[in-house]
């Protein structure tokens, strides 16, 4: 077994501004205290393109990468402030049928099952964490599958804390929904919801919401930009967190990465557009944050949100903790 360790010095960055977010009848006062630690991956044989991370109900962590299609057990340690101080990745197991894993979500009702979204095959499948064997396939709507764009397919994935709702979304606009995001206007993605009656019961497609993504903030870097929705997290109160990321050129020499965290409530009617509220946003230098995992409240008012960066291309691999304090 390989054990790759990333030890992070306690580096305090800043207190991000406190916001009062009104969503339906629920008021959320969110103050994010961000502590950033960055570590380059020096072992070329290690997983340097982590694209998704999840925390199981039994406190186990897993991550996926979009290069090898593997699931990696992880160990995450926090200091007293809630910032990540240790991140260990062990030998991964190949995921049957996956080659471009983007998102992952541990099943709250089955301890050894993790769901994975695969961009290349436009699929959501469940896997045994020990063997990688596919044990279930979630049936996606045909209109969704037949209209995805290359490298902009299904990306974000999460499951509600009670294990009865699964959410999945594409990264950028479907062909049937218009054009992709540009520096002039944002795009539109579909957030699909599936429901089930209990552990092991089949997932049933139960509707979708229209989610507007941000316009790109810069010009193409080396003739390309990256923009869209990359991760979701269910807060368990009827609302979700959405992570958007962007890569563009804002200076002559280097690419610029930007991350933004929004909160929204799914639309009441199928195909309705959601109203999103910005909680946090930052230019994150060379960190391409693609995956996030929400930790339980643990009896307190604070929630830890762990973000991982895909270290492929121009980006570096890093880990960041956002602490959401709800009063």
Predicted regions and their residues:
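Bacterial N-terminal signal peptides
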Residues: 12-24
